[in-house]
Regions:
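Alpha-helical scaffolding flanking metal-ion-dependent phosphate/phosphodiester catalytic sites
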Residues: 157-168, 180, 184-264
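Terminal helices and disordered tails flanking the catalytic cores of nucleotide-processing hydrolases
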Residues: 1-100, 110, 247, 251-264
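Acidic/His-rich, divalent-metal-binding segments that scaffold phosphate/diphosphate chemistry
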Residues: 53-189, 196, 200-210
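A broad detector of the eukaryotic-type serine/threonine protein kinase catalytic domain
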Residues: 24, 85, 139-143, 222, ...
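Residue-level preference for alpha-helix termini and adjacent loops
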Residues: 8, 14, 18-19, 26-27, ...
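Short hydrophobic/aromatic segments of transmembrane alpha-helices and their interfaces
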Residues: 22, 149, 227-228
Length: 264
């Protein structure tokens, strides 16, 4: 399986992963040969590239659960993009709590391991995909840690919103997680604080979300101002955020393995 940028796709290449639209409808299945129309669709969807099979490569097995996970990710990234963009325009995120409830139904009550799929990110879509994955991981952690339903809801909403105003940063800084200069770290910290300020108290969100986000910001970027006692919700967010950042797949960067992330 190799990754091919959208501009380098060729008619007849076989897809290694399925492609869904924003409503979760399967457009192209695994092992389908991509057509000229399909290549145009990829570009219109804003996809930066696809995983394809090499000419003689057999199709690797993929469970129904894994395919459902990819479908869920695709739909929720589109929905989360709309909700975060609404807040950036000073509008109510009308469907954010429904997205929270849907995610908790899917991942907030599991008793078995899942194959956590990392989706490839561009600088333009990094914030949305990162926020969704942190929310999924936070839901999994919160269940195993015995959080109440209210706490689970708070941690998922906070995960959705924790990088909100990074959308205003230059694209190359949005997904940069290693080797930040002091100036870049300051830019990111200011963006995160501005994001908290953009979350209106009038929004229909869990009451503790803004406090949780400020606490998380202090732990991540302003440790000298962080309280000594870190809440369990913030601890879950720190772990989920670090795991996703460490294992994320970005163009031009080699991801770390899950084993590396656990040892981190």
């Amino acid at each position: 399986m190799i990754y091919v940028k959208a501009e380098d796709l060729k008619v007849g290449m076989r897809l290694a992963r399925p492609i869904y639209n924003k409503r979760g409808i399967l457009l192209y299945g695994r092992n389908d040969k991509i057509t000229r129309q399909g290549i145009e669709s990829v570009k219109n969807f804003g996809l930066i590239g696809l995983y394809v099979l090499e000419p003689a490569e057999p199709l690797a097995p993929m469970s129904v659960e894994e395919m459902q996970f990819e479908r869920f990710q695709t739909m929720e990234v589109f929905r989360l993009r709309d909700e975060l963009n609404a807040i950036m325009m000073n509008k109510e995120p009308a469907h954010l709590m429904q997205a929270t409830n849907d995610l908790l139904k899917q991942f907030g009550n599991l008793y078995h391991k899942i194959n956590f799929n990392q989706n490839l990110r561009s600088p333009e879509d990094y914030v949305y995909k990162h926020a969704l994955n942190v929310a999924i991981l936070s839901a999994l952690i919160s269940h195993r840690a015995g959080f109440s339903l209210m706490e689970q809801s708070e941690v998922v909403v906070a995960a959705f919103l924790h990088d909100l105003v990074k959308l205003n940063l230059q694209p190359e800084l949005r997904g940069k997680t290693e080797n930040l200069t002091d100036e870049e770290r300051g830019q990111v910290a200011r963006a995160v604080i501005l994001g908290i300020d953009k979350i209106s108290n009038a929004f229909n969100l869990p009451a503790g979300v803004k406090g949780t986000l400020m606490h998380l910001c202090q732990v991540q970027y302003l440790p000298e101002n962080a309280p000594k006692d870190i809440s369990d919700i913030v601890k879950a967010l720190v772990v989920a955020n670090a795991y996703d950042e460490y294992t994320a797949m970005q163009i031009g960067m080699d991801p770390h393995t899950e084993v590396d992330a656990v040892r981190m």
